């Protein structure tokens, strides 16, 4: 697992400051909504200064992984489980945006307006949120993460590579039937977004939209040998979780009293 050992030499705070300046002057680009991530997304990029590679040979940093996949593939669930198991923070772009849906936030009006009008959150806003989150985490001593919600396009993936040292991208795949059933039966309604976002028509539209860009993102990471495809069947079942751990060459020692791993 040599891909767990790479690290950048430049301070992440320095890189994030540069990225924030460049995007502050850029035209506002937009991101789409995915019900699996609860809200709207954005973009981000690279951290650094690690903890410890899982193979024991890397510098002192945690893993920096991305979870991607079709809407309804339980990315949020698996990202949360992996973050606890690997003892790195789970960063969800959907959650970061949701936190700013507070009248006291300087970004509230811009985000609320986009949500209420079913428009996309500007890219400049998303990058600002992610940059802030990474800076705050680094200041607290965080050196790794499990990220989901981005990248959605090749451009976002390239941008992410300028901010964070992505070690691995887990691509969660599932059948068409599972996607529809999962969205129709398992997702709670979000009041401010309205039930129309969870209708079969909306679900299919999101899936088609995501699929167009997903292929280019998959190819981007596949060429870097960072992509791991994993088929989600029963989604949250114990067998699926154990299958994911096996695919990642991880083993959870004790599910009830320990978060230790073996390779």
UniProtKB/Swiss-Prot annotation:
Protein name: Probable adenylate kinase 7, mitochondrial
Binding site for ATP: 72-77, 234
Alphabetized UniProt keyword annotations: ATP-binding, Kinase, Mitochondrion, Nucleotide-binding, Transferase, Transit peptide
Role played: Catalyzes the reversible transfer of the terminal phosphate group between ATP and AMP. Plays an important role in cellular energy homeostasis and in adenine nucleotide metabolism.
Gene3D superfamilies for this protein: P-loop containing nucleotide triphosphate hydrolases
Pfam families: ADK
Gene Ontology terms, MF aspect: adenylate kinase activity; ATP binding
Keyword Mitochondrion carried by entry: yes
Species classification: Eukaryota, Viridiplantae, Streptophyta, Embryophyta, Tracheophyta
PANTHER family assigned to the protein according to its UniProt record, in alphabetical order: NUCLEOTIDE KINASE
Subcellular location: Mitochondrion
EC identifiers of the protein: 2.7.4.3
Family in the record: Belongs to the adenylate kinase family.
């Amino acid at each position: 697992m040599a891909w767990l050992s790479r690290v950048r030499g430049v301070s992440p705070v320095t890189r994030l400051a540069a990225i924030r300046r460049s995007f502050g002057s850029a035209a506002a680009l937009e991101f789409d909504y995915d019900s699996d991530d609860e809200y709207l997304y954005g973009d981000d990029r690279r951290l650094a200064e690690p903890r410890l590679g899982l193979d024991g040979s890397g510098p002192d940093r945690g893993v920096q992984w991305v979870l991607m996949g079709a809407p309804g593939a339980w990315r949020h669930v698996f990202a949360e489980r992996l973050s606890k198991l690997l003892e790195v923070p789970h960063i969800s772009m959907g959650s970061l945006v949701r936190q700013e849906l507070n009248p006291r936030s300087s970004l509230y009006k811009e985000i609320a307006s986009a949500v209420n009008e079913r428009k996309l959150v500007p890219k400049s806003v998303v990058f600002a949120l992610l940059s802030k989150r990474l800076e705050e985490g680094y200041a607290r001593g965080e050196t790794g993460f499990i990220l989901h919600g981005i990248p959605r396009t090749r451009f976002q993936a390239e941008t992410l590579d300028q901010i964070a040292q992505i070690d691995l991208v887990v691509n969660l795949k599932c059948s068409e039937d599972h996607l529809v059933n999962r969205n129709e039966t398992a997702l709670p309604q979000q009041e401010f977004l309205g039930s129309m976002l969870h209708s079969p028509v909306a679900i299919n539209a999101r899936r088609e939209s995501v699929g167009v860009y997903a292929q280019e993102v998959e190819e981007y990471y596949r060429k870097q040998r960072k992509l791991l495809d994993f088929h989600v069947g029963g989604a949250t079942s114990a067998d699926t979780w154990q299958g994911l751990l096996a695919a990642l060459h991880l083993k959870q020692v004790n599910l009830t009293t320990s978060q230790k791993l073996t390779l």
